[in-house]
Amino acid sequence: MSGQLVQWKSSPDRVTQSAIKEALHSPLADGDMNEMNVPVDPLENKVNSTNIIEGSPKANPNPVKFMNTSEIFQKSLGLLDESPRHDDELNIEVGDNDRPNANILHNERTPDLDRIANFFKSNRTPGKENLLTKYQSSDLEDTPLMLRKKMTFQTPTDPLEQKTFKKLKSDTGFCYYGEQNDGEENASLEVTEADATFVQMAERSADNYDCALEGIVTPKRYKDELSKSGGMQDERVQKTQIMISAESPNSISSYDKNKITGNGRTTRNVNKVFNNNEDNIGAIEEKNPVKKKSENYSSDDLRERNNQIIQSNESEEINELEKNLNVSGRENDVNNLDIDINSAVSGTPSRNNAEEEMYSSESVNNREPSKKWIFRYSKDKTENNSNRSTQIVNNPRTQEMPLDSISIDTQPLSKSFNTETNNELETQIIVSSLSQGISAQKGPVFHSTGQTEEIKTQIINSPEQNALNATFETPVTLSRINFEPILEVPETSSPSKNTMSKPSNSSPIPKEKDTFNIHEREVETNNVFSNDIQNSSNAATRDDIIIAGSSDFNEQKEITDRIYLQLSGKQISDSGSDETERMSPNELDTKKESTIMSEVELTQELPEVEEQQDLQTSPKKLVVEEETLMEIKKSKGNSLQLHDDNKECNSDKQDGTESLDVALIEHESKGQSSELQKNLMQLFPSESQEIIQNRRTIKRRQKDTIEIGEEEENRSTKTSPTKHLKRNSDLDAASIKREPSCSITIQTGETGSGKDSKEQSYVFPEGIRTADNSFLSKDDIIFGNAVWCQYTWNYKFYPGILLEVDTNQDGCWIYFETGRSLTKDEDIYYLDIRIGDAVTFDGNEYVVVGLECRSHDLNIIRCIRGYDTVHLKKKNASGLLGKRTLIKALSSISLDLSEWAKRAKIILEDNEKNKGDAYRYLRHPIRGRKSMTNVLSPKKHTDDEKDINTHTEVYNNEIESSSEKKEIVKKDSRDALAEHAGAPSLLFSSGEIRTGNVFDKCIFVLTSLFENREELRQTIESQGGTVIESGFSTLFNFTHPLAKSLVNKGNTDNIRELALKLAWKPHSLFADCRFACLITKRHLRSLKYLETLALGWPTLHWKFISACIEKKRIVPHLIYQYLLPSGESFRLSLDSPSKGGIIKSNNIFSFYTQFLRGSNLRDQICGVKKMLNDYIVIVWGRSELDSFVKFAFACLSAGRMLTIDLPNIDVDDTEPLLNALDSLVPRIGSELSNRKLKFLIYANENNGKSQMKLLERLRSQISLKFKKFNYIFHTESKEWLIQTIINEDTGFHDDITDNDIYNTISEVR
């Protein structure tokens, strides 16, 4: 029976299966079923109906559907269902003369494969654990064998139909019977459960089995017969439609004929049937004489038919690669049913593995598949995740192909040509030139050759399957390989020409330092696509891709395609030549279109620019360098030339040395320098970054900084101080002294006045200082130009030397170890370092344990006492000092802001050097403190200070730091009001700062104003007033020498006696002012506020200023209208233990009366309250309020004050104070004729809560100790002093009248 077609006719959606006698089945059929020696019911295997359709969709359900991944790899797939069921409704039409004489099983519920394919196309495969079981449609369930029934069918007898191919009526599948014996009358077929997309195998007819049992082929016998045949070139081949994968073709397995075992059951043998070589294509030889006589087709006829089919397929329109893999719906083309076996067998075993492999009974019994399983992924959208997605792949080596034999057919295929996809295990092509832009050729025909080239593919191999030697080779000619060119890097791209684009996977062109030929050395790079590029270079001429395959090609295009990179300091040369190839300027100008300039590397080889040259080169060295420069220029006339002047950009390097410093070129004529800068600007017109290559780093800056400035940039704008250089012990004056303005010699008089400076001689300290027993004062200043400089970015303090005061830029030039810098006046302080100060060195905290002077060079940074070296010990986390001592230069240390606030400062007043003066800046609360301290900053010269003769420039700028000259804001600052004229004002509704003379001869002190402080200050100054930065105490002298001492200094070294009297400082400009007040927003307990209350002067709200300006004068009633209270009085509180007090009004009656009389401020201090004029004040201890305490006692009319310098007294240890009083009180009493005296013992200590206990203990001890004296003792502290100022009363109730004591003290004076 030949050309027999079998079709399921139970429904339009029934599957049509094809079978052949020598059946070639798909890999999926072999993989899904994998059944060997499956027993069949012997009752149904009779002589006349031996061939049963085995594997119909419902006979044996696909076991993969009901197995997880582990079961697929570990268990056998046989014996799934042994109970066949019959169906009586199935009729089969046979398209040949022969009819089977037995019934076949009828599949009652054939699944709709189209619906299944559509389902898996839009849905992903379920998980590994429950593979394909989540689909609940009943249409997928196969009909069990028990429900299948045998049916007979008739076949046409027309002999013309024997060699015809009929178009199938079903759209879902087909089957084709190969040539069979014409003598067969009946045939019984069993359809497997594989999808219709794979050709199923037809079993032999009953006649073939009736001939003899020895005709049955066993595995062993098959191998023997196959070896005897010697080749299968002349064997007739069955024509079978093969289902292949578009990406990873696999080898093909087929069924052998069935055999009947001894127990009466029919078994089925499975073996490999193809050796897929062009010279050796054959089928299974069954050695059956009946079969030999019944074969009708030869292999030559089959090849001829296949060629016709392939030619028909070539006429199809070629779509894109994604569309090529879709199923073709054409039903009119009969040739679509057949595909050449050569194109189907993609995974072909090599000749070494030509021997057929068969399943053995041991593999069945052990239920372990001997082939590997691969879940393959494909871009095909037609049948994702179908039940064929799990297949047995015989040939794992699918990543190699012959070079000369590949031509992939990308025409639309039939619907049965599907791509199996599954994402569980991916076989993915990573890099392949065949996957892009390959034109369609003939159907896949693969030939095995010796030359192979691997295609980069990632594949998962089964551990139990040995790799075969079948390979794929790269085709000889590819229509086109579309490589995406890599764009050039923006920094190096040419603005005028894009000469070459490289393949996407190629390596970058090696950057040769001295070459401009981009084609040079291209051949030396290893390109993985070099073979592909050479094969496809002719086809890719339409693209702008220039690929140099050899050095000869580069030499030919060297001149025409060369790109010149114009650099300022590099000559144009080839990297491989020793001689420099120079182009003329005309040639360079004519090739502007091929000359490019790198935006980032325009000035890559510019010489080094040193802005600090004036500080780092001595005049002698400059002269030597100038001579050297002239000699070098004679030998290198073209070392730096520009193309704009018909010169060539060239800067050679000899012996690896760096380029010459631009600082040397500065000393040429100004004409040459300006011409150089002009040419540089013309050469680089774009605003690109300039690269200055220094010895250590490469600095980048904007192009507009190419001019070499005479002055250094302001140091406050830098992110960090200049890096410290190594200290050079043999540094001479010439190395630092660059010009007269940079001289470090101390000058007197006004800077920049043109007068000759007078150098002074200094006495340098000797030895190593290890202790400081007293605080520093202005008497210790030897080097007045030694300063601390606060850096504005990190607020650290660095040592330096004050060079000069720049009046134009309102700052000072400070020399550091790394150079000089312009610094603001308020950031400069005296370099007053002492033993015990905590400093920072190399990021760690150290304590100064010694000071030493090792050099007498005036240009070395040293402190005000002359020490230039410090001895340091590291401070541990526990606070203890380490044992190791470091000796470092003073210029290498710095101070943190926290340590700066804790240390004692130099005392610049004429008072004695005590702790209170050293820490006086702490008397201001932090909230009201404007800066670290305002009294230590060297200021610029002013006209008012010309007549003051001081020994140093710094101290000259800081004359009488507590006087009004330093503390007030000069009226010259009124000129700056023009800049703020348009600024909105909070003081006036009009929003303008008016000018006038409302506050002429008036002084103001501002405190606790943070929002509109500056605006208020400008407003006062615009109306003629003066703002004092510190309090009113700086306007007075309140300590005076005594005319007669009450104690003998020889016996009391730690006791000092002062005469307190409030008096204006001499030459004061404010004594003749008519009005003074403090401006704030509320009543406070600040020092400025308390000083104003002690003087009896008004404390006013800040709106008093705007009210007076509106009235255009100071109206007297406005003073009381905006007068603020004096503060909280705890003495007026009814409940004294309570924390709160009573707000008391301010009493300014005396001041107000004098103001109405027109008196000036000189007369305003005459009416100071005399509350302590009959008391002898004894102050012991030190604090930051020492100056305020003296001023307050002077305002309260305390005539005499004695200070006892004692260490801090503990509550449990008051003996030192009692012993001092025991010797002092009797002597005072004897000097005052033993009269009744009043003593006020004031504890100038900050002991917090323990102070009250200390006061109570002292009161009791003093009363007991001096009980025999008829004296009055009062022991008080800071809170009492504040309450006395607020309440205008001491709170003492003594029996002795004030007049008696006052007269007694007056007699002593």
Curated annotation (Swiss-Prot):
It comes from the Eukaryota. Pfam families: BRCT, Rad9_Rad53_bind. Residues 284-299, 642-655 have a biased composition (Basic and acidic residues). Residues 994-1122 form the BRCT domain. Residues 1-39, 280-299, 342-365, 490-512, 636-655, 691-731 are annotated as: Disordered. It is found in: Nucleus. Residues 1-19, 343-352, 491-508 have a biased composition (Polar residues). The modification Phosphothreonine is found at residues 218, 471, 474. GO terms for molecular function: double-stranded DNA binding; enzyme activator activity; histone binding. InterPro entries: BRCT_dom, BRCT_dom_sf, BRCT_p53bp1-like_rpt1, Rad9_Rad53-bd_dom_fun, TP53BP1-like. One of its GO terms (biological process) is positive regulation of transcription by RNA polymerase II. The modification Phosphoserine is found at residues 26, 56, 205, 248, 312, 315, 462, 568, 729. GO terms for cellular component: chromatin; nucleus. Keywords: Cell cycle, DNA damage, DNA replication inhibitor, Nucleus, Phosphoprotein. Physically associates with RAD53. Present with 400 molecules/cell in log phase SD medium. This is DNA repair protein RAD9.
